[in-house]
């Protein structure tokens, strides 16, 4: 936990941007019946029944101090998908920086091995492509059960409230909606003012220790 908090306390450096990454599944939902249109004095009426149109995955990147944002939609959440997103991060979003300081959770696909799986040595792909991408990164993982430390999780929550508070029935429409949302976020360069600091950690740890001890005592009495 201290490692991630120390990263968040680093001063802004455009040559060493701190970027947070996260992903979430999304359920594509269609209307079982056509909604009744809005009328004067009445909101649009939407039936409670819906049609499941499968799932997809949303990947999000946010630079808290620089205000850069990127979201993408993929049909799956595999090592290949993650590797391609990381290549986009390195080669399109930050092609000229010295190092990208990347914060993310410790998901099984969020590993250097995923890059080597996607970009193996071949006649088409250079032998050192995966290594080249990895050398651009300085990775910091959030601890187990500590995904709340990933600022990209906050970004996904904001995105859900602002853009995904209605049914979207297919990937094409979802991509259009999120693309428009991304443009807006980048236009205003929305930044994140992270307040939780390393100096507050002992107090939080003490509270967690007290809570766990109280829970164990309750379980023992029961």
PLM region spans:
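RNase H-like two-metal-ion nuclease catalytic core shared by retroviral integrases
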Residues: 56, 105-106, 134-161
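Short mixed-charge
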Residues: 119-136
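C-terminal domain-tail junction helix/linker
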Residues: 32, 173-222
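Active-site proximal helix-loop segment of RNase H-like, two-metal nucleases, encompassing DDE(D)
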Residues: 69, 144, 152-170, 184-188
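Mobile genetic element proteins and their domesticated derivatives, centered on retroelements
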Residues: 20-22, 61, 86, 105, ...
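Short, basic/hydrophobic alpha-helical segments
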Residues: 80-101
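Acidic/histidine-rich, metal-coordinating catalytic segments
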Residues: 97-111
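Extended, low-complexity cationic-aromatic segments
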Residues: 1-87
């Amino acid at each position: 936990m201290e490692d991630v908090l120390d990263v968040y306390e680093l001063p802004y450096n455009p040559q060493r941007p701190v970027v947070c990454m996260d992903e979430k599944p999304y359920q594509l939902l269609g209307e079982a019946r056509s909604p009744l249109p809005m009328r004067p004095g009445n909101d649009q009426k939407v039936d409670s029944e819906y049609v499941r149109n499968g799932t997809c995955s949303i990947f999000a990147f946010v630079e808290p101090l620089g205000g850069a944002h990127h979201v993408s939609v993929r049909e799956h959440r595999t090592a290949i998908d993650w590797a391609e997103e990381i290549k986009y991060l390195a080669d399109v979003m930050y092609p000229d920086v010295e190092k990208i300081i990347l914060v993310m959770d410790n998901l099984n696909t969020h590993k250097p091995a995923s890059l080597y799986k996607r970009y193996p040595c071949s006649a088409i792909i250079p032998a050192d492509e995966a290594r080249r991408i990895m050398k651009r990164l300085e990775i910091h993982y959030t601890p187990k059960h500590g995904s709340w430390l990933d600022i990209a999780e906050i970004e996904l929550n904001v995105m859900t409230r602002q853009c995904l508070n209605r049914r979207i029935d297919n990937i094409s429409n979802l991509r259009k909606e999120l693309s428009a949302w991304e443009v807006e976020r980048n236009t205003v360069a929305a930044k994140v003012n992270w307040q939780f600091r390393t100096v507050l950690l002992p107090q939080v740890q003490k509270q967690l220790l007290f809570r766990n001890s109280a829970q164990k005592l309750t379980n023992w009495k029961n």
